Amino acid sequence: MARMKFLCDAERCIECNACTTACKNEHDVPWGINRRRLVTIGDGEPGEKSISISCMHCTDAPCIAVCPVNCIYQTEIGIVLHDKDLCIGCGYCFYACPFGAPQFPTATNFGSRGKMDKCTYCAGGPDADGSEAEYRKYGRNRIAEGKLPLCAEMCSTRALLAGDGEVISQIYRERTARRGYGSGAWGWTTAYYMSERSS
């Protein structure tokens, strides 16, 4: 079965923010929450690189391991999802994530963070019934419609790729061979190291 992955090629990203805008608009993401964001490394310096960051849906996701109520889980195709009805807002997932993907929209005077929100790889939530309630919690389920995440579809330079991990890695190998060097695949080894090593 396909193992869904993201890849951001820093050599191609032009920091246009199409991916972040597409995500916010597609899923009606609340103010203050960014399921996907752009980061520029070495901003204003020669050789600066921009990367699009979100949940990378890691092979061995540390957020799953630290969640005390098991609200974070991985689907059979490798997408890391969460159940907002189970989330207690402890924030352990935020501290465990190397990409800073889990976010908490509300904070109170007593330290409660509210329910965690993060990229769902456009796969909706645990019910996947397409209901209005499901949409309000998790956004649109494009995967059930046979589509890829909108952030990757909207990337005009194809810096952000999403889909079957074998296909994505083949595309990146071809780009690397054409360029003569790699290193533009930000987050790939951090998120998918265990599966790449074992194959």
Predicted regions and their residues:
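Non-ligating segments of multi-cofactor redox enzymes
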Residues: M1-S199
